[in-house]
Amino acid sequence: MPRRREVPKREILPDPKYGNVELSKFMNVIMEGGKKAVAERIIYGALDFIEKKNPDKDPLEAFTVAINNVKPMVEVKSRRVGGANYQVPVEVRPVRRLALSMRWIKEAARKRGEKSMALRLANELMEATEGRGGAMKKRDEVHRMAEANRAFSHFRF
């Protein structure tokens, strides 16, 4: 790792339709191979689908609630102590929390069976707002691992 200077965080511009920075970050997570227009179409399609299903709810609010529900509070990191590897529970930093929740929602949506990615993403987001779905399962699994290894929490980093 270079020891020079800390690289400054790049400022991400808000998305054109809703003016939301988090949505713009999620667009970058969904994007593959630099195809931002495709990622944009998928996300806006998913949000439109959410709006059609629940006309009284704001789709951006549903997106925010889903992201916040999936955010992990703790995770485990491997730590080698005296020839043995321990899974040590550590608190997740806010930036990583957001990144993990977005990544997990994307992965859970990819594994779903619906036809289009927009539909998969919409259903995954709606399930995450209700506290269920693949991404929530992943978060609960990570929390369970941290809880199971709570005895090793004194091996701090």
UniProtKB/Swiss-Prot annotation:
SUPFAM superfamilies xref list: Ribosomal protein S7
Any single biological process term in GO: translation
Coiled coil: none
Any one Gene Ontology cellular component term annotated for this protein: small ribosomal subunit
GO molecular function, one term: structural constituent of ribosome
The UniProt record lists the keyword Ribonucleoprotein: yes
Pfam families: Ribosomal_S7
InterPro entries named in the record: Ribosomal_uS7, Ribosomal_uS7_bac/org-type, Ribosomal_uS7_CS, Ribosomal_uS7_dom, Ribosomal_uS7_dom_sf
Keyword terms, alphabetized: Ribonucleoprotein, Ribosomal protein, RNA-binding, rRNA-binding, tRNA-binding
Family per record: Belongs to the universal ribosomal protein uS7 family.
Protein role: One of the primary rRNA binding proteins, it binds directly to 16S rRNA where it nucleates assembly of the head domain of the 30S subunit. Is located at the subunit interface close to the decoding center, probably blocks exit of the E-site tRNA.
Subunit architecture: Part of the 30S ribosomal subunit. Contacts proteins S9 and S11.
Name recorded for this polypeptide: Small ribosomal subunit protein uS7
Gene that this sequence comes from: rpsG
